[in-house]
């Protein structure tokens, strides 16, 4: 379960390696997020176009908790990962590393699905 103060891996080539969740968008009482939700993060390690201590928005693309599909199956991953976003909700990087779920295209992130190496 991803909540505030959770550390996540970055799944794009924006330059950041690890981020820390400092906020959850979508209401004041939300305590945890799932795949496809937008969070506010700060960069903890990495170099490149984004620097340490930058505050950005990100979308969750993989979780250890997993995602339940309508047919009853679950998809779980080995890590919790995000893709960093600009203020207008476009992605910063040009490549997406690792698998993502196809449900992201239903949540208006079809660019992430098209750039991903593997779509489950």
Swiss-Prot record:
Q: Name one GO biological process term.
A: translation
Gene Ontology cellular component annotations, sorted alphabetically: cytosolic large ribosomal subunit
Point out the coiled-coil segments of this chain: none
* GO molecular function terms attached to this record: large ribosomal subunit rRNA binding; structural constituent of ribosome
Say if the entry is tagged with keyword RNA-binding: yes
Q: Which InterPro entries match?
A: Ribosomal_uL14 (IPR000218), Ribosomal_uL14_bac-type (IPR005745), Ribosomal_uL14_CS (IPR019972), Ribosomal_uL14_sf (IPR036853)
Keyword entries, A-Z: Ribonucleoprotein, Ribosomal protein, RNA-binding, rRNA-binding
Q: Which Pfam families match?
A: Ribosomal_L14
Which residues are connected by disulfide bridges in this protein? Answer: none
Q: Which family does it belong to?
A: Belongs to the universal ribosomal protein uL14 family.
Subunit record text: Part of the 50S ribosomal subunit. Forms a cluster with proteins L3 and L19. In the 70S ribosome, L14 and L19 interact and together make contacts with the 16S rRNA in bridges B5 and B8.
HAMAP family named among the record's database cross-references:
Ribosomal_uL14
Known function: Binds to 23S rRNA. Forms part of two intersubunit bridges in the 70S ribosome.
Q: What is this protein called?
A: Large ribosomal subunit protein uL14
Q: Which organism is it from?
A: Aster yellows witches'-broom phytoplasma (strain AYWB)
Q: What is the lineage of its organism?
A: Bacteria, Bacillati, Mycoplasmatota, Mollicutes, Acholeplasmatales
Q: Which gene encodes it?
A: rplN
């Amino acid at each position: 379960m991803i909540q505030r103060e959770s550390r996540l891996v970055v799944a794009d080539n924006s330059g950041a390696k690890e981020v820390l969740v400092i906020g959850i968008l979508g209401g004041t009482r939300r305590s945890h997020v799932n795949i496809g939700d937008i969070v506010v993060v700060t960069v903890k390690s990495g170099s490149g176009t984004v620097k340490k201590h930058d505050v950005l928005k990100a979308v969750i693309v993989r979780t250890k908790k997993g995602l339940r599909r309508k047919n009853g199956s679950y998809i779980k991953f080995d890590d919790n990962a995000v893709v960093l976003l600009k203020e207008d909700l476009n992605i910063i990087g040009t490549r997406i590393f690792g698998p993502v779920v196809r449900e992201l295209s239903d949540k208006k992130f079809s660019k992430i699905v098209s750039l991903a190496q593997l779509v489950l």
